[in-house]
Amino acid sequence: QADVGLALGTLYGNVFSQTTICRFEALQLSFKYMCKLKPLLNKWLEETDSTTESPINLDKIAAQGRKRKKRTSIEVGVKGALENHFLKCPKPSAHEITSLADSLQ
């Protein structure tokens, strides 16, 4: 559902959320909004059906998936320093956070 919403945005300029697509499928949107979405979904479905016959286009469709953010990793030493600091001062001010960040770089 999220991929459908993203594909609609890529092709037609309107990104629709996973929730919207889900509610469309469950007929839980207003009649007016359903009438707005139906032509876009029909057009997308026809284009998708016609392009999936070619193996080259399958790669393009797969490449349209959402890009995920990389997982943040913190070095062991930095993690220890942060944990020690927050044990001493659980609610640091913005200035203290900035100073701590500068000292850890």
From Swiss-Prot:
<dbReference type="Pfam" id="PF00046">
    <property type="entry name" value="Homeodomain"/>
</dbReference>
<keyword id="KW-0805">Transcription regulation</keyword>
<keyword id="KW-0539">Nucleus</keyword>
<keyword id="KW-0238">DNA-binding</keyword>
<keyword id="KW-0804">Transcription</keyword>
<dbReference type="GO" id="GO:0006357">
    <property type="term" value="P:regulation of transcription by RNA polymerase II"/>
</dbReference>
<feature type="domain" description="POU-specific">
    <location>
        <begin position="1"/>
        <end position="49"/>
    </location>
</feature>
<dbReference type="GO" id="GO:0000978">
    <property type="term" value="F:RNA polymerase II cis-regulatory region sequence-specific DNA binding"/>
</dbReference>
<dbReference type="InterPro" id="IPR050255">
    <property type="entry name" value="POU_domain_TF"/>
</dbReference>
<dbReference type="InterPro" id="IPR009057">
    <property type="entry name" value="Homeodomain-like_sf"/>
</dbReference>
<dbReference type="InterPro" id="IPR001356">
    <property type="entry name" value="HD"/>
</dbReference>
<dbReference type="GO" id="GO:0000981">
    <property type="term" value="F:DNA-binding transcription factor activity, RNA polymerase II-specific"/>
</dbReference>
<feature type="DNA-binding region" description="Homeobox">
    <location>
        <begin position="67"/>
        <end position="105"/>
    </location>
</feature>
<protein>
    <recommendedName>
        <fullName>Homeotic protein NRL-19</fullName>
    </recommendedName>
</protein>
<comment type="similarity">
    <text>Belongs to the POU transcription factor family. Class-3 subfamily.</text>
</comment>
<dbReference type="InterPro" id="IPR010982">
    <property type="entry name" value="Lambda_DNA-bd_dom_sf"/>
</dbReference>
<dbReference type="InterPro" id="IPR013847">
    <property type="entry name" value="POU"/>
</dbReference>
<keyword id="KW-0371">Homeobox</keyword>
<dbReference type="InterPro" id="IPR000327">
    <property type="entry name" value="POU_dom"/>
</dbReference>
<dbReference type="GO" id="GO:0005634">
    <property type="term" value="C:nucleus"/>
</dbReference>
<dbReference type="Pfam" id="PF00157">
    <property type="entry name" value="Pou"/>
</dbReference>
<keyword id="KW-0010">Activator</keyword>
